[in-house]
Amino acid sequence: MRLIYSALVTAAAMVAISNGSTPARGNEVETRSLRGGNEVDSSMSDDGERAARGGGRVRSQASGVTRHVGGGGPFIGFWYPYYNFEEKKEKKEKHHLSDEYEEYRRIAAEVKRKRQDKRLAERQD
């Protein structure tokens, strides 16, 4: 019975972590020096809550690091906290475009070679 209870608690904790309800890790919370001293900027936590509900991204203004929060599959926020889906998608698109560009360059080089061969044939005649 204790084993089942501890397994459920562990699973609930992992789900909570993957959904973005993690405590702040050092420089991910922006602090501002106000009259009374340092106070945590509440807008940053609001953005984090919004991203956790929608499965979006949180960009830390202090560190400049984008952290994926929740969404995108089970436990993705727990196992890959800095995983950037948009960047991976852009890399795939760029790779595809570079393949198309290589094909274009190959065809252009072939046309250029044919023109040079034609000029050499005209000069030899």
UniProtKB/Swiss-Prot annotation:
Motif RxLR-dEER: where in chain: 32-50
Domain statement: The RxLR-dEER motif acts to carry the protein into the host cell cytoplasm through binding to cell surface phosphatidylinositol-3-phosphate.
Induction remarks: Expression is up-regulated at the earlier infection stages.
Family from the record: Belongs to the RxLR effector family.
Coiled-coil parts of chain: none
Protein name stated in the entry: Secreted RxLR effector protein 22
Subcellular locations according to the entry: Secreted; Host nucleus
The protein's role, per its UniProt record: Effector that acts as a broad suppressor of cell death to interrupt plant immunity. Inhibits cell death induced by cell death-inducing proteins, including the PAMP elicitor INF1 from P.infestans.
GO CC annotation: extracellular region; host cell nucleus
UniProt signal peptide: 1-26
Principal localisation: secreted
Region feature (Disordered): 21-66
Keywords assigned by UniProt, alphabetized: Host nucleus, Secreted, Signal, Virulence
Organism: Plasmopara viticola
